[in-house]
Design a protein with these regions (language model features):
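N-terminal glycine-/charge-rich "phosphate-binding" loop or analogous flexible N-terminal tail
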Residues: 1-51
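Rossmann-like dinucleotide/phosphate-binding beta-alpha-beta segment
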Residues: 138-219
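Short acidic low-complexity segments
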Residues: 38-47, 61-64, 177-192
Length: 311
């Protein structure tokens, strides 16, 4: 019987393996695998000694020497910041999650639809009942259908393609931008109603969306970032939003955000997180790095590992 050690300890419940997730893993992996869950780093390193597979959020390069039988190192995350994948010895397969593209695509689609239907309009900002200030007339020329609009998805890997497929299902024309056609981005941006960033932080894309690229966008354009915060010049984006240079933005990731996924800025808050939320432009929607939240998150991860031959 082969052994898989599961060390998925994380503050957010959907990212933490508890009894229901472990039961799902046993069902998905089948009887040929023995499942061992660890809660502490020391317990994980002990269990790693005779494990063929490890499912983790983070893995240090020195740990490979403690895992002579390891054949698969898997992490649910798509980002590569927490796993020493470059140091994996020959014979060890490193697997990064791609399943959450479908979840993140729903988050992007939710913003797109809510924006088009006027859900974020300032006319609706009051929490009071409408009363005499019934905003129906004011809202009547602010809504539109998304079918026939144009989206540019930058970062067209598994996550980006899932986002593109979801938007295409809504009737949106999608152009994907990857390393192969990165030079096309300025031209494509000029016709974008939706500019979606789904980039990891290790691809040399720091401040890809800067004042120059923003100036290429139509005034009707909205920016979405569900990749990593390093891809945006936040000062330039805030200025464009405040001036009405672009129509809106949805940011799920930021420069210097708290927690283990903070970028190389040393944890220093970027321009968006440094501003009190009430002072942010009203056409900016911010979320706490939650575009992949789903109660089924880890079960989807385990199914992907099974389908990809890791279990």
């Amino acid at each position: 019987m082969k052994k898989v050690v599961v060390h998925l300890e994380w503050p957010e419940r959907c990212f933490r393996a508890e009894a229901p997730e472990l039961a799902a893993l046993r069902r998905i992996a089948g009887p040929s695998w023995r499942i061992v869950r660890t809660r502490t780093e020391n317990a994980f390193l002990r269990a790693l000694r005779d494990a063929e597979c490890a499912i983790v959020w983070s893995f240090r390069k020195e740990w490979f020497a403690k895992a002579p039988r390891l054949r698969t190192l898997a992490t649910p995350g798509a980002g590569r910041e927490l796993v020493a994948w470059r140091d994996a010895p020959p014979g060890v397969r490193v697997h990064f999650g791609g399943f959450h593209g479908a979840i993140m695509a729903e988050s992007v689609a939710a913003y797109v639809l809510a924006s088009a239907r006027g859900f974020f309009r300032p006319e609706l900002a009051s929490r009071r009942p409408f009363g005499k200030t019934w905003p129906r007339t004011a809202l009547s020329d602010k809504c539109f259908t998304v079918a026939g609009t144009n989206a540019v998805v930058v970062g067209y890997g598994r996550v980006g393609r899932a986002i593109g497929a979801k938007l295409e299902a809504l009737g949106i024309a999608v152009d994907g931008v990857s390393r192969a056609n990165a030079g096309e981005l300025p031209r494509l941006a000029a016709k974008a109603d939706w500019l979606v960033l789904a980039l990891p932080s290790d691809t040399g894309t720091d401040r890809l969306l800067d004042a120059r690229l923003i100036s290429r966008l139509p005034r009707r354009a909205r920016v979405v970032n569900v990749g990593r915060g390093n891809a945006i010049d936040e000062e330039a984006l805030l200025a464009a939003l405040a001036s009405g240079r672009i129509a809106g933005a949805y940011l799920d990731v930021f420069r210097g955000e708290p927690g283990p996924l903070a970028d190389a800025g040393g944890g220093t808050l970027g321009a968006v997180l440094s501003v009190p939320r009430r002072s942010l432009p009203p056409n900016l929607v911010v979320m706490p790095h939650s575009s992949a939240f789903a109660s089924q998150y880890l079960e989807l991860c385990f199914k992907e590992l099974k389908n990809d031959g890791c279990l």
